[in-house]
């Protein structure tokens, strides 16, 4: 099966078969990351620009490693070191970058929809590395890959997502992807951090009580409190938040015995989850980071026109 999209803007745009293709390719590419020499010539001669308007550690580093393991050339541009600080618009930045003939632009931007705007104005491929509160497709894919490795499937899983849903592009990508793959998503968080109508995105249940969301869950995914996006009225204190929506060993016992604990990072330890849980046997947080490289290799591979056998 060939991947038919020029860009990857969000999981909302992808079919179940396309998501499976990206996950299966990532699973195949993981083997490269275990070799002594972690490089294949698949994207030799391709140029990838990582254009980040927001701070990032895991995503930007992971995309750069993914590109280099496929032998692509990478250029990293951050807003703080670019002409953006001089007032250059996204449109002008895009046209100037495009004039240098890149093959793929990987972009993170604070404004939801920025990637749609960019993709309409450039001829090269665009991959969304996070746009506002809209989507973070690579995170959603790596989360699903991590779950599938543990349970062998996504269909029928109960996945609890707890935290700041309003500002979370990770939550939205997981909702789109997981519900398309047959999982049931349960959401919990403070009422001020739960957007109205979120349940209309798929097979989603909104719970007022965190306990209801995580009871008998296969996966408990905790989200970071995005302090940089909070208004004064959304979060009284971190202590109060942790009291009602923080995960500890006692609460984790409500989930299934073999439940996974996940977090997209960075973690606010002692707020959304305690260190005992973050570093415990049920934590798959570092496995998520590990899988991120393979997933982003898969995304780069497929928007470059790669095709794998269906079997």
Curated annotation (Swiss-Prot):
Q: Which domain of life does the protein's organism represent? A: Bacteria
Q: Where does carbamoyl phosphate bind?
A: 58-59, 108, 136, 139, 265-266
Annotated InterPro entries: Asp/Orn_carbamoyltranf_P-bd, Asp/Orn_carbamoylTrfase, Asp/Orn_carbamoylTrfase_sf, Asp_carbamoyltransf, Asp_carbamoyltransf_Asp/Orn-bd
Which GO biological process annotations does it have?
Answer: 'de novo' pyrimidine nucleobase biosynthetic process; 'de novo' UMP biosynthetic process; amino acid metabolic process
Q: Which reaction does it catalyse?
A: carbamoyl phosphate + L-aspartate = N-carbamoyl-L-aspartate + phosphate + H(+)
Keyword Transferase in the entry? The reply is yes
Name the keywords, alphabetized.
Pyrimidine biosynthesis, Transferase
Q: Which cysteines are joined by disulfide bonds?
A: none
Which function does this protein serve?
Catalyzes the condensation of carbamoyl phosphate and aspartate to form carbamoyl aspartate and inorganic phosphate, the committed step in the de novo pyrimidine nucleotide biosynthesis pathway.
Q: What is this protein called?
A: Aspartate carbamoyltransferase catalytic subunit
What is the organism of origin for this protein? Geotalea uraniireducens (strain Rf4)
Gene designation per UniProt: pyrB
